[in-house]
């Protein structure tokens, strides 16, 4: 990923927070080049865990492979109508690229634990959270239909392209315009821009 110096994100805690909050990611493998959009969970141990449908043959290329997991935060079109001087439109965004070594999880109990963890995470905060009893035969049979994996981060790159190359007045105009948006992704960009002022 091309990252000019002024767009480089280096704070690991900030990058990890992005990866946890925007966990619906893109997993890319090679030979042939394949991408799958899926939830990936960054765990406290710094490893990323996920699963693919067994019918998705991408899992066959995971074991021992270098893979790329892309996490994308909010993004927004930036109109020159908010600039203080004449310029061109652009796009603001924040993204993290995790280059990883992949390992398949063969242990059924570990796979069950991963799936239970994922459901509990995404159900938390709901008024009536769905409860999973992974010991039930139904869920054990479902585990056979997926392949769980673990990704060890080898290299991590992150970029925040948030109009840092523009004058403060322009950045403020852009941020204020994005704050008015009904689109939560655009408001995320505004919030990230505000932290830079």
Locations of regions flagged by a protein language model:
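A generic structural signal for short beta-strands and their flanking turns/coil linkers
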Residues: 23, 36, 46-48, 63-67, ...
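Short, charged/polar surface micro-motifs in flexible loops or helix N-caps
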Residues: 32-34, 41-48, 54-57, 73-77, ...
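An N-terminal domain-cap segment
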Residues: 1-48
């Amino acid at each position: 990923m091309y990252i000019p110096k002024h767009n480089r994100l280096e704070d690991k805690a900030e990058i990890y927070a992005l990866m946890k909050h925007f966990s619906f990611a893109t997993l890319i493998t090679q030979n042939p080049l394949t991408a799958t959009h899926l939830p990936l969970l960054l765990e406290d141990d710094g490893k990323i865990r996920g699963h693919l449908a067994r019918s998705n043959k991408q899992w066959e290329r995971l074991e021992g492979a270098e893979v790329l997991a892309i996490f994308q935060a909010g993004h927004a079109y930036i109109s020159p109508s908010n600039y203080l001087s004449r310029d061109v439109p652009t796009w603001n965004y924040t993204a993290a690229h995790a280059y990883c070594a992949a390992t398949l999880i063969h242990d059924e109990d570990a796979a069950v634990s991963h799936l239970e963890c994922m459901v509990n995470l995404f159900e938390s905060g709901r008024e009536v959270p769905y409860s999973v009893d992974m010991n039930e035969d139904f869920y054990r049979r479902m585990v056979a239909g997926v392949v769980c994996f673990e990704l060890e981060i080898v290299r991590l790159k992150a970029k925040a392209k948030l109009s840092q190359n523009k004058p403060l007045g322009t950045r403020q105009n852009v941020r204020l315009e994005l704050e008015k948006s009904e689109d939560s992704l655009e408001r995320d960009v505004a919030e990230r821009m505000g932290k830079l002022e």
